[in-house]
């Protein structure tokens, strides 16, 4: 599951506010990384529905992403709307 450096750089370039690969701390980058991991875990749980540890990890990731989205919504509403559209997240 672990993303290699190139995949992470692609995610950061695509979704970061500054469009640089080193922008790992921006909320957009964090949300995109969480979304990637959530997608992977969702597919994993479809194949292995009894994997309770992965289910717990998925629930925690969704909570972390939700907190980041709330922060972004309260601080920069336009950036929030852009990332929601780019990632296709329903809110």
From Swiss-Prot:
Gene3D superfamilies assigned: 6.10.250.3130, S15/NS1, RNA-binding
GO cellular component terms, semicolon-separated: cytosolic small ribosomal subunit
Entry keyword RNA-binding: yes
Keyword tags: Ribonucleoprotein, Ribosomal protein, RNA-binding, rRNA-binding
A matching Pfam family: Ribosomal_S15
PANTHER family tied to this protein: RIBOSOMAL PROTEIN S15, BACTERIAL AND ORGANELLAR, SMALL RIBOSOMAL SUBUNIT PROTEIN US15M
Subunit structure, interactors included: Part of the 30S ribosomal subunit. Forms a bridge to the 50S subunit in the 70S ribosome, contacting the 23S rRNA.
Function noted in UniProt: One of the primary rRNA binding proteins, it binds directly to 16S rRNA where it helps nucleate assembly of the platform of the 30S subunit by binding and bridging several RNA helices of the 16S rRNA. Forms an intersubunit bridge (bridge B4) with the 23S rRNA of the 50S subunit in the ribosome.
Family: Belongs to the universal ribosomal protein uS15 family.
This protein's name: Small ribosomal subunit protein uS15
Annotated source species: Amoebophilus asiaticus (strain 5a2)
Protein's gene: rpsO
